[in-house]
Amino acid sequence: MAKEELVEFGGKVSEVLPDNRFRVILENGFEVWAYSSGRLKKNRIRVLAGDRVTLEMSPYDLTKGRINYRHKS
């Protein structure tokens, strides 16, 4: 998939799940499943419940996303 086809959303992590997955509530109120991007894993950036994040999602499946940025609090 080309990077131009991804849709970006902002949200807040509501729950941390096993295996580096998260439940995120988007700014529009929807709740989605998300996982950490490779860059976050490589740099050991911890994502905790309550953190504001930016997600990349495929326009074909808006129930799952990839966290690509954790905003500074």
UniProtKB/Swiss-Prot annotation:
Q: Which CDD domains match?
A: S1_IF1
Tell me the ranges covered by the S1-like domain, including all copies: 1-72
Recorded source organism is Cupriavidus metallidurans (strain ATCC 43123 / DSM 2839 / NBRC 102507 / CH34)
What name has this protein been given in UniProt? Translation initiation factor IF-1 3
PROSITE patterns given for it? S1_IF1_TYPE (PS50832)
* Compartment(s): Cytoplasm
NCBIfam families, alphabetized = infA
Q: Which gene encodes it?
A: infA3
Q: Which UniProt keywords apply?
A: Cytoplasm, Initiation factor, Plasmid, Protein biosynthesis, RNA-binding, rRNA-binding
Subunit structure, per the record?
Component of the 30S ribosomal translation pre-initiation complex which assembles on the 30S ribosome in the order IF-2 and IF-3, IF-1 and N-formylmethionyl-tRNA(fMet); mRNA recruitment can occur at any time during PIC assembly.
> What this chain does, per the record?
One of the essential components for the initiation of protein synthesis. Stabilizes the binding of IF-2 and IF-3 on the 30S subunit to which N-formylmethionyl-tRNA(fMet) subsequently binds. Helps modulate mRNA selection, yielding the 30S pre-initiation complex (PIC). Upon addition of the 50S ribosomal subunit IF-1, IF-2 and IF-3 are released leaving the mature 70S translation initiation complex.
Superkingdom classification of source: Bacteria
